[in-house]
């Protein structure tokens, strides 16, 4: 399996730490977020990874050249910040070069978790979904809506009102963890261009009948480390990230 680490963001929530470094190089207990994520992916047997970069991209490239993670790591440099969907579409070549239907993992660099990625992958393969999202039942301003079959059917709007793309009477709000398994056939269905969120693509395709599935992972540790508060919490929660994250 191959993977993409989304690391191109400006890291505005982590300022001033990201004034002089990309957020992927922010450290927890002496280890960069990028190292933690790469090590975790490798522990699940992933050895081919592409990382997108924009803010201070040269520093990220230098870092990867100076550290050997025992993996093939490509960098997708974005002159313009493309958001999650645009960034993935730009990196499509990396997944297409396999010439197979092998699904791939997409993982935000600014989340730490103990989510079982093998379980997520297995669920994806068995369900036949176009994408499978790790989700939790927690409060967030950006909840997605899933029907009784745990298939995407909408999202909460800025005023906390449901915005449904499928005619569902029963739905539940769940928080996306920034970790998902995707089938490469999604690239042929990506009509969006330029800067766009992968959630925009998911919602459009769900409205067309594509199966965008959820796997609840409430029993696993998860932490957003894209804020100073989250970073501090993670630092206190872990004494050995190599065994926990």
Functional labels for PLM-detected ranges:
Residues 19-23:
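Short alpha-helical oligomerization interface
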Residues 145-147:
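Short beta-strand-to-turn element immediately C-terminal to the catalytic PLP-Schiff-base lysine
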Residues 127-137:
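A short, conserved acidic/glycine-rich loop-to-beta-strand motif
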Residues 2-5, 13, 27, 31-108, ...:
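Conserved N-terminal catalytic core of the sugar/cofactor nucleotidyltransferase
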Residues 8, 53-54, 109, 136, ...:
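Cofactor-binding loop segments of dinucleotide-utilizing enzymes, especially the Rossmann-like FAD-
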Residues 46, 104-105, 112, 118-125, ...:
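Catalytic-core segments of class I nucleotidyltransferases/pyrophosphorylases
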